[in-house]
């Protein structure tokens, strides 16, 4: 099986073309491939499939390192767009894809950045899903004997965003896994720790569902900005500084889609016998 290794700001992926190859990934195989000592090693596996709708170009599937399939990965979406052009699967600059839960448009810019229309953030607890009696801008939660205030949003996948004074000293290792598997998140969640530098600049660390803390999380950056704008703490355009690099997020507010722009890097191509 041929594959490519790619990353978006250090969030690394194994990308596989299932348009021209016949492939099947069991959870066990994905876990074996994800092992950084015994396999290829990655945060997520991205699979390019033929479209289910003639109006679309591809179907985009995402699997975490633990073998679970998820509906959204923003950094992966940028790498997906770069991959299909590099491999000659399309020469379009605006690439329309379906995911497990919806549709996306991935646009490759002249300077080889990728702008992703992530759709409109959804704060409805039932959609996230998040157990709450009504929609709030801020929720109070108990985790690891701490009381935390957080915002909750779906970017096609569930996110919980906490505001912290300093991302360097944030209790990511303590609170991340506890909140990820909290009973109020029936499908688990990605946990963002956001430090607001100014209305146009935040620093962010993300503990990803099924992967742990990563160098960058695109949908997590989108979620943090969406929550910050909802809470009237951030402007419409925000520079998001992650451990692996920076993203530009733009959202005009309710009724509008959110856009994420950033790089996608091809590292190497490989072949593995399964």
From Swiss-Prot:
It holds the Pfam family DAP_epimerase. Gene3D superfamilies: Diaminopimelate Epimerase, Chain A, domain 1 (3.10.310.10). It is found in: Cytoplasm. GO terms for biological process: lysine biosynthetic process via diaminopimelate. Keywords: Amino-acid biosynthesis, Cytoplasm, Isomerase, Lysine biosynthesis. The record marks 159, 208 as: Could be important to modulate the pK values of the two catalytic cysteine residues. InterPro entries: DAP_epimerase_AS, DAP_epimerase_DapF. Disulfide bonds: none annotated. Its main location: cytoplasm. Belongs to the diaminopimelate epimerase family. Homodimer. Catalyzes the stereoinversion of LL-2,6-diaminopimelate (L,L-DAP) to meso-diaminopimelate (meso-DAP), a precursor of L-lysine and an essential component of the bacterial peptidoglycan. This is Diaminopimelate epimerase. It comes from Serratia proteamaculans (strain 568).
